[in-house]
A protein has these predicted regions:
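Non-catalytic C-terminal accessory region of glycerolipid acyltransferases
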Residues: 4-5, 96-230
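Conserved beta-strand scaffold positions in the cores of enzyme catalytic domains, especially
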Residues: 25, 62, 85-87, 143-145, ...
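N-terminal membrane-anchoring alpha-helices
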Residues: 1-22, 218
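A short, well-structured juxtamembrane/interface segment
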Residues: 14-35, 176
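Short, basic, glycine/proline-bearing loop/turn elements
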Residues: 12-14, 82-88, 115-120
């Protein structure tokens, strides 16, 4: 059931995006055809998960703040779960959500979408949470960076029925997190900055916010599979 809900919702969104907005996806050739994958992106609006899922065209799963599940009807909660969302308690180490994510990522075709900022930041990127690092390190799978521009105008989820404006989704090259063992706090923050820098470099400078310098820095904790990488 979840697969069909996800596929139907994404197809419907692609239709409305094509009809009512100037919607373009760049870098689709960077999306791995198979294998488990973590997707990381900047977070501008409530419709970001849907925009991202319809762009990468994989059966994505999401970690979503638990308050979203608490503020909707039972039918709304059913749809959220059917679409692939799982509640995450923010402000603490949610071990239940972490176990769920790691279990999901064992599936051969798993796609887990994360917004490291943890909350919407319309316009420019803000500081990300460090939880992405231990999760990605334990999973040991490719990470796909995505930069979304122009989505900040879609503040209401109802906007998916009539999106407007220019929306750009830019998909970067997959990369790996090169860490072993437990990192110090400083190294963890540096790894987070690199992950966010790989998102920021896909965005206009005005969107980069706290990660303007990270987008231009040398990458140490992350690398792609290409010899030409940093």
């Amino acid at each position: 059931m979840a697969f069909f809900v996800h596929r139907f919702a994404n197809r419907a969104l692609r239709v409305t995006l094509a009809l009512f907005s100037d919607f373009k996806i760049e870098g689709q050739e960077n999306i791995p055809a198979d294998g488990p994958l973590i997707v990381v992106a900047n977070h501008q609006s409530n419709v970001d998960p849907a925009i991202l899922a319809t762009s990468i065209q994989r059966n994505a799963r999401f970690l979503s703040k638990d308050t979203i599940f608490n503020n909707v009807t039972p039918a709304g909660r059913w749809f959220l779960r059917a679409y692939g969302a799982y509640p995450l308690r923010r402000g603490e180490m949610d071990l239940k959500a972490l176990r769920w994510a790691l279990t999901e990522l064992k599936r051969p075709t798993a796609t887990l979408v994360l917004f490291p900022e943890g909350t919407r930041n319309p316009g420019s990127m803000k500081s990300a949470h460090s939880g992405i690092v231990p999760l990605a390190a334990r999973a040991g799978i490719p990470i796909l960076p995505v930069g979304m521009e122009g989505v900040e105008g879609m503040r209401s989820v109802l906007r998916i029925f009539k999106p407007k404006g220019s929306i750009r989704v830019r998909i970067g090259r997959p990369f790996h997190l090169n860490v072993q063992g437990k990192l110090s706090r400083n190294d963890t923050e540096a790894a987070v900055s690199e992950i966010m820098g790989r998102i920021a470099v896909l965005l206009p400078e005005s969107y980069r916010g706290d990660y303007k310098e990270a987008a231009e820095a040398t990458f140490v904790f992350t690398s792609t599979n290409e010899l030409s990488d940093d």
